[in-house]
Amino acid sequence: MKKTIRITVLTALLLTLSLASAGTMAGAKTKNGFTYKITKNQVKIVSCSKNQKRIVIPNKIAGKKVTSLGANVWKKSSKVQTVVLPKYLKTIEKKQADYAWGNIVKKKNIFSTPFTGCGKLKNIKVAKGNKYFCSAKGVLYTKNKKTLLVYPAGRTQKSYTIQGKTTQIGEAAFEYAKYLQKISYGKKLFYISDGAFFASGLRSVELAKNISNVGLYAFAYSTKLQKVTLGDKVEQINTPFIGCTNLKQFQADKKEIGYYAVNDVLYYKDKKHI
């Protein structure tokens, strides 16, 4: 019987799925290009009209601590390359889109994040003293580096090595990273979240070592992806390769419990075609 993993998201207190309606802007104020709302003496940034290479989000606005970053802060930004997150930031929202099949085939991303529209973003930095997040050479992680949260889409390097402590890749973490061709990771990584590599530039993927769960549409529309290798720990994959039009080859470890490959076609062990 194929096993199913139930994962408790380690960053539930940090990454809130925003299901808010269009009424989000009600009661908002604007100062120095930042539109914000104050709730219980804490500031949430809901949008930013600044379109410049470097943007520093202030630690405080109107004397209140900036603790939250909304899912649509930059819907589209053609210039921003560096963002500095504030000292008191606790929450980075990700708005879950409609998973309906019609939206997926139209190549609509399944999450909106504060950085989704920042195609030239290369570095995310964190103000000194922040207790919840850290930056590893411009890539955003939780403070303990257990979860990789955001890999800036505008980085031009062809390969990236995930921190050795990291156990999971967050939702939409590598979305639109079109220059990225290869990803490497340590033995502790076991979970790849929904939409993690949506529309990325990856050429090949090795789901080996300790990876056991691959989220919904994790590699969707990575149109340059050609080869996928499954290791002996993979227990659950959730339609991760929709829109991968150049995917030609599947390989599965002979000892792998849940899947096997014949002539580059992936099957469940019960011989039902995936």
Per-range role (PLM):
Residues 44-45:
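Conserved functional micro-motifs across diverse proteins
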Residues 1-12:
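Bacterial N-terminal signal peptides that target proteins for export
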Residues 19-32:
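Sec-dependent signal peptide cleavage junction
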Residues 33-41, 50-68, 78-94, 98-111, ...:
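Structural signature of tandem-repeat unit edges
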Residues 241:
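Conserved, function-critical positions that sit in or immediately flank catalytic
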Residues 11-20:
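Bacterial N-terminal signal peptides
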Residues 48, 72-75:
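Acidic, Ser/Thr
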